[in-house]
């Protein structure tokens, strides 16, 4: 078992990483006997896990209700938030209840945002079941839903009471979704940690076999990197946390342009990181050799390195102008300057960005 703590002034919460955590009531901290909870999950996971989780929690003395939502990014919406609120009110959940997010990034975002809003804020627990959520989305307190004009446009900073990462949940994850999570792990290597990037190169085959030791190291290293950044820049105020968005401005534009249907988030991030690297190369900040190295690792992770559904580059650029990091009508992009290093660049010529999008999509 690996455990770390995120400390934010007087607030702190644990992240626990191991196999078999869902089998033990003590794993579900800070729940205790007599508590009331509402588990939020989706139609894919409910048949696999709902009954066993209910048994563990009810044997521990928790009064548990649940809501099952449709599965998919297109359901990360205000309509789904309304469904959660309605269920909480119908089942008489007050300010001392606990929401439990059991799912991937969509469920985590929905549950966290609902917790931030319901009766002006209630406790919630993150139990991420996808690799993407385990290495990234469940940590740091960013919660949001999408709008038709942009991804993650409506949300709040709201930290969970704990994060419970059971590696066994990955056994049911389809390969495409598993690879989507690997994109976020690779992002940490490109943006922050050259040694971790090298480790990913050396251990990609073990990760794809879902070797428990390799997964444990990968997840814990990603959590360590993100935890450190969140503790230094919780609300994205000094620019450090923004570096976690390497490739994401491009990726969110791809997802918005394709209506969240054709690309998983990690697939869009994979393409977006290459767009960022191409932009950096055009600015003389990044080598072609390193772009080739990144492409090779992404391909080994079964990730796309170019568009596989028709995308209009000019529309992508327009969507990018809606990004939350835009200031004074100027794009602010996270650009790699070497493998393991990244910086924020403002005011990059739109023609350079557009050319990078076109080249990567070809």
UniProtKB/Swiss-Prot annotation:
Molecular function in Gene Ontology: 3-dehydroquinate synthase activity; metal ion binding; nucleotide binding
Residues involved in Zn(2+) binding: 184, 248, 265
Entry's EC annotation: 4.2.3.4
Cofactor note: Binds 1 divalent metal cation per subunit. Can use either Co(2+) or Zn(2+).
Pathways per UniProt: Metabolic intermediate biosynthesis; chorismate biosynthesis; chorismate from D-erythrose 4-phosphate and phosphoenolpyruvate: step 2/7
Cofactor requirement: Co(2+); Zn(2+); NAD(+)
Any one Gene Ontology BP term: aromatic amino acid family biosynthetic process
Reactions that this protein is recorded to catalyse: 7-phospho-2-dehydro-3-deoxy-D-arabino-heptonate = 3-dehydroquinate + phosphate
Keywords on record: Amino-acid biosynthesis, Aromatic amino acid biosynthesis, Cobalt, Cytoplasm, Lyase, Metal-binding, NAD, Nucleotide-binding, Zinc
Function recorded in the entry: Catalyzes the conversion of 3-deoxy-D-arabino-heptulosonate 7-phosphate (DAHP) to dehydroquinate (DHQ).
Protein family according to the UniProt entry: Belongs to the sugar phosphate cyclases superfamily. Dehydroquinate synthase family.
UniProt-recorded name of the protein: 3-dehydroquinate synthase
Organism per entry: Hamiltonella defensa subsp. Acyrthosiphon pisum (strain 5AT)
